[in-house]
Each structure stands twice: as structure tokens, then as C-alpha cells.
């Protein structure tokens, strides 16, 4: 009986000792719907960043955990973008710029995801719709915070359409 008590006590101590506190500096992006982003654009012009994901995508989960949970990333997105999380396999209709997009059973994906990526589906994909509502700019693949920084700052600082990306890339100094 004594050894059972010690075993239980040791188990509880182990559980509390191994329990992790949230990592310091971790924050989350405050995601909104596409409709909310569109309404917000009427009040204040900002680019829209869309995280295009699927439920089964492992790299999408890694990007959520490592990139979008990064304090500097989330703070910058909160300040400069309207951030939208969009399931590419979602079945709800989406209205955008006077057009309605629906789930496409032939491709087993949403027509809006096909539109955003120009038909080049890959997950995760970060899509940025610049302020002037030009074509969506799709950046496929997992992006670590240091790689993500240059891309979002190119759009967030208003350089898209003014300066070629390769010129911005040469002048860019990372601060994350």
C-alpha cells in the first residue's frame, strides 16, 4: 500500500513537473471572415492576407504553430493586414467582388481557392490581395517567420506595384 501511495505521488509530481507553460512571446493572429475583411476595407484600406489551408494538411498546422503564433508575425499582421483563414475544401458559398464562388465537387475544392491560386492548388498557400484590389498574389508552401517577414512587409509597407520584388529583396533588412 505504501508503494502504491508513493507511485501515485510520484505520478502527480511528474505530471506537474512536465506541464508546459505557454512559451513567452507567443501570440495568435486574430482571424476574421472574408466578409468581415471586406467590410473593414470600406473603413480603412489594408491588404488582405488569406491563409489557404485544408484540415488534412500537416504543413498548414506547422505554419499555424510556428509562423502565425510568432509574436512579431501576429503583431505585424494585426497592424497592417486584414487576416483571413480559409479552408480550401469548405462548402459554404463565398461572395467576392460581385461574384459568388461555390464548392467544386469535380476538384473537391472551393472555386474561390481555385481563383485565389490561379488553379495552382498547394497547401498551405498564403494569398495577399493588395489594397488596390489587383489580382491575388499567391505564395505557395510553408513559410518560416524569417521568410514570411520579407513577403508581408513588401505588401504591408506599400511596395507592391511601386517597386519590383527583387529590388525590394536586395534592400530588405530583416528585423525579426
Regions found by a protein language model. Name each.
Residues 1-24:
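Bacterial Sec-dependent N-terminal signal peptides
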Residues 29-48, 77:
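A short beta-strand-turn-helix
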Residues 61-65:
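Detector for the c-type heme attachment site
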Residues 60, 70:
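Ligand/cofactor pocket segment of small-molecule handling proteins
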Amino acid at each position: 500500500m505504501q508503494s502504491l501511495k508513493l507511485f501515485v505521488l510520484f505520478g502527480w509530481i511528474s505530471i506537474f513537473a512536465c506541464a508546459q507553460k505557454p512559451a513567452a512571446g507567443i501570440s495568435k493572429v486574430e482571424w476574421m471572415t472574408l466578409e468581415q475583411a471586406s467590410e473593414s476595407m470600406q473603413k480603412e484600406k489594408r491588404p488582405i492576407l488569406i491563409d489557404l489551408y485544408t484540415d488534412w494538411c500537416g504543413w498548414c498546422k506547422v505554419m499555424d504553430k510556428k509562423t502565425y503564433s510568432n509574436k512579431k508575425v501576429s503583431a505585424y499582421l494585426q497592424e497592417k493586414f486584414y487576416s483571413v483563414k480559409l479552408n480550401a475544401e469548405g462548402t459554404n458559398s463565398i461572395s467576392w467582388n460581385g461574384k459568388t464562388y461555390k464548392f467544386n465537387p469535380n476538384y473537391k475544392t472551393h472555386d474561390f481557392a481555385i481563383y485565389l491560386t490561379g488553379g495552382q492548388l498547394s497547401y498551405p498557400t498564403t494569398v495577399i490581395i493588395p489594397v488596390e484590389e489587383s489580382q491575388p498574389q499567391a505564395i505557395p508552401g510553408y513559410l518560416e517567420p524569417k521568410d514570411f517577414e520579407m513577403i508581408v512587409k513588401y505588401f504591408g509597407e506599400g511596395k507592391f506595384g511601386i517597386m519590383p520584388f527583387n529590388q525590394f529583396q536586395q534592400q530588405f533588412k530583416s528585423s525579426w
